[in-house]
A protein has these predicted regions:
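A generic structural motif
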Residues: 59-63
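Short beta-strand-to-loop junctions in surface cap/lid or active-site-entrance loops
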Residues: 42-50
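Conserved beta-strand elements of the Class I
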Residues: 52-55
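Short acidic, Pro/Gly- and aromatic-enriched capping/linker segments at domain boundaries
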Residues: 26-34, 140
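Active-site/substrate-binding loop(s) of hydrolase catalytic cores
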Residues: 50, 64-66, 70-211
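C-terminal accessory segments enriched in acidic
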Residues: 1-10, 15, 19, 23, ...
């Protein structure tokens, strides 16, 4: 099994592109935007359902393993769909995906992904490259994009506070790409794959786009036991945050 160090951004991009060509009857490949360092952000749609659920990973370069796993999951789902297999003798994948398709975006922040793998010299823009080097952060611990911004906390919410020059809500290309695709597609749900304890702050609007709602999404990757042990402390934290609600209304952002 390849590790994240063996999986290049280009390999991830082309694996999704090739999957769409091979399984063209029920998949669609799309570039939803470009990063500040001019890398394309790919998305693979699986299934033919009218409703969709977004599966997103790679907000931070340090979440490279989640990017790799989500890519593998997408390819495996394509194979299962084509063969019309039933998973665990319970889940009819083809039937489910023909009702609700998956929109998989495994690498939202391709610049950060490449920086963690190859170092700051992989940044093409010389100004961005020099600014990042001046921050004196080890490349394998770097969590931002090519401009040094945290894309997971760049969405227009009450949590988005300006900490750097030129930083405003939705100031980053990666953030705007997600907002556009969420607004275009709507959606029935959002799954964010990220490292333990990390949070992605995103916004949500009703279909008429008049009233904003804000939700805190996090994918902690805990075991069920650990989740139960931490339930009390988690509840205390959520009292000060917007409530997490599962609704059938379209989700229009992450």
């Amino acid at each position: 099994m390849d590790t994240v160090q063996d999986k290049t951004y280009e390999a991830i991009y082309y694996s999704l592109w090739e999957a769409a060509r091979r399984y063209s009857s029920f998949t669609q490949f799309r570039v939803i935007g470009k990063s500040h360092d001019d890398r394309m952000i790919p998305m693979l749609e699986i299934g033919q359902g009218d409703a969709c659920i977004f599966c997103v990973a790679g907000f931070s370069g340090t979440d490279g393993q989640m990017t790799d796993r989500l890519t593998r999951m997408a390819l495996e789902l394509c194979r299962i769909y084509e063969c019309n297999w039933t998973v665990d003798e319970l889940y009819e994948v083809k039937k489910l995906l023909d009702q609700t398709r998956l929109c998989i975006i495994p690498v939202v922040n391709p610049d950060g992904y490449e920086i963690c793998r190859k170092g700051y010299n992989t940044v093409r823009n010389p100004i961005f490259r020099q600014m990042l080097k001046m921050q004196d952060v080890p490349c394998d611990e770097f969590e931002g994009n090519a401009r040094g911004m945290d894309t997971a906390r760049n969405f227009p919410t009450t949590f988005c506070s300006r900490k750097k020059i030129h930083q405003q809500p939705a100031s980053e290309n990666e953030t705007r790409a997600l907002i556009r695709i969420f607004q275009e597609y709507g959606g029935r749900g959002l799954l964010v794959f990220c490292g333990y304890g990390k949070k992605v702050v995103y916004y949500r609007r009703d279909q008429n786009f008049h009233h904003g709602r804000w939700i805190l999404a996090q994918e902690p990757l805990k075991t069920a036991t650990a989740a139960r042990q931490n339930s009390r402390s988690d509840q205390k934290m959520l009292w000060s945050q917007p409530s997490i609600r599962a609704k059938d209304s379209p989700v229009t952002s992450s």
